[in-house]
């Protein structure tokens, strides 16, 4: 659906690739990344590497794919107990609601949830391999180490303690992760792209990963982590808490190296920065773009070879006014702006109608395409007569200012945000309407599932009308007429893609809109929570960001082009020569039950 139509199958997600890259740099070379959007028939019970089931099976999932993740866990539990892999879960679902994947409700459970980043996983594996005896199955090692309390000093985990019948008695939370301070120490993303499973309809695995020559054809856009964190504290956003109010960046040298290697080894020319707010700190941003502007790839300037985009806020874009030409010279061609509400009625991040219009004008003058992202909310009408408060009024202004694409989502409760529980207790959250009930995949912002209005169906139709007002045959025709005056021939393409996406969005959401219109609306005041006790370890306090080179006693050796992570425990146990087999399925947008 909009706004992710078609991109969901054309971008291999950065998160699961980062885990795969970390495993490769840690010595686990026999790793496979299975993307659900490419391999919809994949079943863990059918996976084989070198003729046997892997020792370690990991699932990365967003909240909207929670049901699919549970199905994966259940299928993996069908493997014979003697060869059953250790099952780990990660991703946003595991970070904010780990208990839901650990058997708190009686369903088949994962063994442990990783509630942090790559190095939490590597720290866990180092602990397990230090206790491994010979070729002892990794899951048996985990159970033994877990029962003796050996996991309690690894921040960023949640695991279950069970009785003799394997019934969950309590969940143990080892506390917040210790953040990686220097993002240059992250594993190089080039390794993750070399682990992708070939797209197919098979239930099992191919003999080998997707050839390098075919990677860019299936994933033409490469998403890269450039920065983490945002200085704004929006009540509906979980990002500040996850990043522990810190802002972390990669250096321009590291980013240039990643783009160069991905371009040279896989043929990537399109990149998307997985940033929360790329312009968050102007001084750090300038260091990055200054280096990229001086970088050469394949014999020419980077901006002649590479097309990349990222996300930022309107206010921070205005703070970069004098430097936007340099940003463009660094190769930035498009920026997705968190406009939310131009009048700052929903949230005030320093944006205003004049400021937003000026930011769009400055970006266009610099040769950068502005891509607005909006949030619809209860207090915003569809149309207003005397001001710019209405949704269609703002869509009109954004289109007039040069917006090429449009994103309109309804504000929804987000686990991990400050307002999450209050949204439920205040009676805003819908449990169902008519014969339909709210399911996990409806938490993506396309469905109105939280509203104080007696007629929430109006908001559902407002979103569709806003998209129809922006994407339609008339606008396609006008974009073709204005083609010579625009920066890029992106207008007609965006209109055609947008109209196709609108068709899918109508097909997927119209039933819910009609249920809201005709059915009885049911609300809930209880937010999702664990049905079993969660014990927070006193020995796992909130810790500051650290240098992981010190944590691993100097065994992490980051070299800009050949970054490696060496763990003496792995080599001593022979993991380098006979690596533990890993499996990484990824549950991704638009893959719903």
Region locations from a protein language model:
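Radical SAM [4Fe-4S] cluster-binding motif and immediate context
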Residues: 168-171, 184-185, 189-371, 376-380, ...
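Short helix-capping segments at alpha-helix termini
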Residues: 26-28, 78-84, 108, 294-304, ...
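Flexible glycine/acidic-rich beta-alpha junction loops that bind and position SAM and/or redox cofactors
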Residues: 6-7, 96-100, 232, 282-283, ...
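Radical SAM enzyme core and accessory elements
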Residues: 2-5, 49-55, 97, 162-165, ...
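Glycine-rich beta-alpha loop elements in corrinoid/cobalamin-binding modules
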Residues: 15, 22, 30-180, 416
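Glycine- and acidic-residue-enriched helix-capping/strand-helix junction motifs
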Residues: 5-16
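Catalytic cores of alpha/beta
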Residues: 98-105, 322-323, 381-399
């Amino acid at each position: 659906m909009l706004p992710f139509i078609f991109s969901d199958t054309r971008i291999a997600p950065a998160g699961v690739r980062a885990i795969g890259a970390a495993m490769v740099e840690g010595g686990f070379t026999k790793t496979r990344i299975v993307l659900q959007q490419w391999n919809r028939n994949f079943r863990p019970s059918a996976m084989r590497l070198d003729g046997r089931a892997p020792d370690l099976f990991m699932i990365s999932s967003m909240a909207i794919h929670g049901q699919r993740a549970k199905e994966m866990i259940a299928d993996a539990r069908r493997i014979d107990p003697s060869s059953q892999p250790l099952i780990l879960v990660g991703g946003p679902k595991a970070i904010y609601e780990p208990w839901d994947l650990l058997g708190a409700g009686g369903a088949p459970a994962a063994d442990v949830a990783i509630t942090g980043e790559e190095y939490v996983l590597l720290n866990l594996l180092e602990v397990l391999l230090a206790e491994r005896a010979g070729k002892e199955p990794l899951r048996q090692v985990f159970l033994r180490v877990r029962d003796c309390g050996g996991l309690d000093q690894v921040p960023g985990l949640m695991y279950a303690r069970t009785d003799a019948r394997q019934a969950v008695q309590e969940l143990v939370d080892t506390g917040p992760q210790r953040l990686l301070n220097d993002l240059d120490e992250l594993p190089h993303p080039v390794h993750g792209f070399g682990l992708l499973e070939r797209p197919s309809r098979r239930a099992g695995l191919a003999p080998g990963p997707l050839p390098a020559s075919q990677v860019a054809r299936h994933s033409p856009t490469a998403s890269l982590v450039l920065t983490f964190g945002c200085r704004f504290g929006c009540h509906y956003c979980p990002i500040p808490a996850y990043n522990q109010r810190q802002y972390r960046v990669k250096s321009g040298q590291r980013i240039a190296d990643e783009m160069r290697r991905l371009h040279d080894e896989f043929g990537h020319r399109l990149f998307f920065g997985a940033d929360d707010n790329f312009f968050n700190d102007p001084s750090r941003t300038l260091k990055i773009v200054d280096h990229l502007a001086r970088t050469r790839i394949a014999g020419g300037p980077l901006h002649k070879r590479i097309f990349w985009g990222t996300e930022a806020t309107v206010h921070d874009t205005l703070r970069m006014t004098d430097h936007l030409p340099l940003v463009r010279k660094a190769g930035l061609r498009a920026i997705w702006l968190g406009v939310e509400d131009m009048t700052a009625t929903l949230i005030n991040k320093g944006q205003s109608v004049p400021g937003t219009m000026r930011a769009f004008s400055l970006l266009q003058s610099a040769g950068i395409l502005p891509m607005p992202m909006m949030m619809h909310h209860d207090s915003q009408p569809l149309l207003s007569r005397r001001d710019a408060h209405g949704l269609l009024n703002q869509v009109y202004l954004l289109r007039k200012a040069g917006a090429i694409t449009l994103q309109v989502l309804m504000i929804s409760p987000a686990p991990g945000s400050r307002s999450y529980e209050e949204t439920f207790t205040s009676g805003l959250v819908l449990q169902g309407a008519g014969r339909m009930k709210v399911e996990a995949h409806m938490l993506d912002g396309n469905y109105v599932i939280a509203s104080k209005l007696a007629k929430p169906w109006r908001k559902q139709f407002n979103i569709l009308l806003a998209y129809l007002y922006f994407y339609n045959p008339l606008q396609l025709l006008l974009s073709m007429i204005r083609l010579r005056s625009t920066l890029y021939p992106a207008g007609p393409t965006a209109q055609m893609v947008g109209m196709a996406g609108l068709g899918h969005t109508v097909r997927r959401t119209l039933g819910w809109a009609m249920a809201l219109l005709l059915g009885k609306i049911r609300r809930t005041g209880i937010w999702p929570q664990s049905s079993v006790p969660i014990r927070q370890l006193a020995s796992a306090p909130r810790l500051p960001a650290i240098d992981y080179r010190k944590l691993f006693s100097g065994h992490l050796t980051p070299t800009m082009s050949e970054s490696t992570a060496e763990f003496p425990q792995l080599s001593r146990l022979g993991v380098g020569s006979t690596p533990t087999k890993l499996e990484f399925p990824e549950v991704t947008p638009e893959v719903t039950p």
